[in-house]
Amino acid sequence: MLLHIPGVFTRDEVGRIREALEQADWADGKITAGYQSAKAKHNLQLPEGHPLAQEIGAAMLDRLWQNPLFMSAALPHKVFPPLINCYTAGGSFDFHIDNAVRQPKGSPERVRTDLSSTLFFSDPEDYEGGELEIQDTFGLQRVKLPAGDMVLYPGTSLHKVNPVTRGARYASFFWTQSLVREDSQRALLFEMDGAIQELTRDVPDHPSLVRLTGTYHNLLRRWVEV
């Protein structure tokens, strides 16, 4: 399942974030790549623990934990602290699959990467190239969203970032360990939750709503890992 989550940050917020990122000191993006990924990764990144990355990441997570679409689709259990990157001057990241488990620097906590997310801080017209290409059971998707919007997709997906040939592409990326490990099960629960919400709005007193909601929670109880 690939999902577009619009408006995580407002236009004004994105403008302030981008202005701060343009003044930041960047490091080689290979610092957080695995052995194979490092061969394919050609970008810049704020180091883990950088104060600006922590500030932006905390604001992102605060918004996402209050975002019904993210909560319904991801069913989050743990989140790897968001990282910030920049692609410019031909920067790219060839096809790869993210590491299955990530461990934040200086933390004993491990996060299984069930879901990957990219939140854009640059508008599509700000740069040439830089499309996020995601290959999975839903086919090949090319993603280039407005600043402030986010894409959520399975961590098992083969994906890449095309070379940026003009301008700069600023974004944040992170991983989520879901309460439900299997993508097809999460997708089923997401569709069912959406149907329940629509029925609650359209026919709030329908007696079948109680049974349908009960079925949702029984499936969640069967599949959840805590």
Swiss-Prot record:
GO terms for biological process: DNA damage response; intracellular iron ion homeostasis. It comes from the Bacteria. Pfam families: 2OG-FeII_Oxy_3, PKHD_C. Fe cation binds at H96, D98, H159. Its EC number is 1.14.11.-. Residues 78-178 form the Fe2OG dioxygenase domain. Disulfide bonds: none annotated. Its cofactor is Fe(2+); L-ascorbate. Binds 1 Fe(2+) ion per subunit. The keyword Signal does not apply. The keyword Oxidoreductase applies. InterPro entries: Oxoglu/Fe-dep_dioxygenase_dom, PKHD_C, PKHD_hydroxylase, Pro_4_hyd_alph, Pro_4_hyd_alph_FE2OG_OXY. GO terms for molecular function: 2-oxoglutarate-dependent dioxygenase activity; iron ion binding; L-ascorbic acid binding. It is an enzyme of class 1 (oxidoreductase). 2-oxoglutarate binds at R169. Keywords: Dioxygenase, Iron, Metal-binding, Oxidoreductase, Vitamin C. This is PKHD-type hydroxylase PFL_0865.
